[in-house]
């Protein structure tokens, strides 16, 4: 069994791949800079969190409807109900994990000495 050597990337191919990135993200000056839309980023992050929590809530509601429909006999398809409940459980578990990590980071910052 022969192993072929890795062929280096041709410089022209590398430049063609980097051109769209460089056009969209020009490098201006050296050192840290404050983005012009810094306040907008904070608002976008808050909006992102709100939308993510709303999605988790919607999945929980769908799972409740599916389990109620399964219990009352309105839903005959067991896999759809189980899939809805698993989606809701996984999304809630992920949300709790993210919350725990954020709290751990907050506590770590609060323990830092100035």
UniProtKB/Swiss-Prot annotation:
It comes from the Bacteria. InterPro entries: FliE (IPR001624). GO terms for biological process: bacterial-type flagellum-dependent cell motility. GO terms for cellular component: bacterial-type flagellum basal body. GO terms for molecular function: cytoskeletal motor activity; structural molecule activity. The keyword Zinc-finger does not apply. It is found in: Bacterial flagellum basal body. Its main location: other. It holds the Pfam family FliE. Keywords: Bacterial flagellum. Belongs to the FliE family. This is Flagellar hook-basal body complex protein FliE. It comes from Desulfitobacterium hafniense (strain Y51). The gene is fliE.
